[in-house]
From Swiss-Prot:
GO terms for biological process: negative regulation of DNA-templated transcription initiation. Residues 7-63, 92-135 form the SpoVT-AbrB domain. Keywords: Cytoplasm, DNA-binding, Repeat, Transcription, Transcription regulation. PROSITE patterns: SPOVT_ABRB. It comes from the Bacteria. It is found in: Cytoplasm, Nucleoid. This is Transcriptional regulator MraZ. It holds the Pfam family MraZ. It comes from Chlorobaculum tepidum (strain ATCC 49652 / DSM 12025 / NBRC 103806 / TLS) (Chlorobium tepidum). HAMAP family: MraZ. Signal peptide: none annotated.
Length: 155
């Protein structure tokens, strides 16, 4: 199944709820089949991660599970590996999709991203990223000259 693609802007309400675009909801709501019924299961859970670039990253359970498997390989007895695990889980939260297609973001998550009223949601293949609109535009304009060299180097 194709990844998340596209960009939409939505308002965050006074309770910190953000509407997930319908085209993205369709993608992550259809997970593996329910073992009991054989029907496609619906998983309204998303993992929210505070990224270093000031955005929030949203992961569906199957994608986060792959990352978690990598973390499980790290040793609690290795100080660097233990630190990394602690730092990742300290930046992670879990939220659920409500019946209106919204997720509730904690004040801590909103503050990290600088989101007050509006947010831009970008489909970024296996994840979605959530940005404060001006912060995103500043990042894109400040780095516009880097696009072609980066694209030529990595894709």
């Amino acid at each position: 199944m194709p990844g998340f693609i596209g960009r939409e802007q939505h308002s965050v309400d006074e309770k910190g709820r953000l509407l997930i675009p319908a085209r993205f909801r369709r993608r992550f709501l259809l997970q593996e089949n329910d073992p009991a019924t054989g029907a496609p299961s619906r998983s309204p859970v998303l993992y929210v991660f505070k990224a270093d670039d000031g955005s929030l990253e949203l992961y569906e359970p199957s994608v986060w599970s792959e990352k978690e498997q990598q973390l499980l390989k790290l040793s609690d007895f290795n100080p660097d590996e233990r630190l990394l695990t602690t730092m990742i889980y300290a930046r992670l939260d879990q939220t659920e999709l409500d019946r209106s297609g919204r997720i509730a973001l904690s004040r801590e998550m909103l503050d990290h991203a600088g989101i007050v009223k509006d947010a831009v949601i970008i489909g970024a293949n296996a994840k979605m990223t959530v940005w404060e609109p001006l912060r995103l535009e500043r990042l894109l304009s400040d780095n516009a000259s880097r696009f072609a060299p980066l694209a030529n180097r990595y894709i």
